[in-house]
């Protein structure tokens, strides 16, 4: 379950990223560490996300977070690029990665399996469509816990 501050952090980070020509693709707040680590994953839609993108976002976001005083205590801010092994979350990502190999996790298991591997066809409001060696598998979205790009292929 996401930390309760994550939605507020996303609301704050998104316009900061957009101003820099970047996109926020994920936020995780690891509070089990001391000090806690706030990780913000970004993407540069125009080119490969580089260290310069992460540094610019880190400086801008740190200033915004400090001014907003959302996080009450000391924390470490990490800004990074999720890379190819990332999870797919947004409709835009599902469209962008159509045809790519993915790993789908379901809970409870669907049709006797908890992990599905194949090529992403598409998803709609109810179903995700996966190509497994020419066979179309329709997995209910309500059972899907994670869709991740398969970097092994």
Swiss-Prot record:
Keywords: Cytoplasm, Ribosome biogenesis. One of its GO terms (cellular component) is cytosol. It comes from the Bacteria. GO terms for biological process: ribosomal small subunit assembly; translation. Signal peptide: none annotated. InterPro entries: Ribosome_maturation_RimP (IPR003728), RimP_C (IPR028998), RimP_C_sf (IPR036847), RimP_N (IPR028989), RimP_N_sf (IPR035956). The keyword Cell inner membrane does not apply. It is found in: Cytoplasm. Gene3D superfamilies: Ribosome maturation factor RimP, C-terminal domain, RimP-like superfamily, N-terminal. Belongs to the RimP family. Required for maturation of 30S ribosomal subunits. PANTHER family: RIBOSOME MATURATION FACTOR RIMP. This is Ribosome maturation factor RimP.
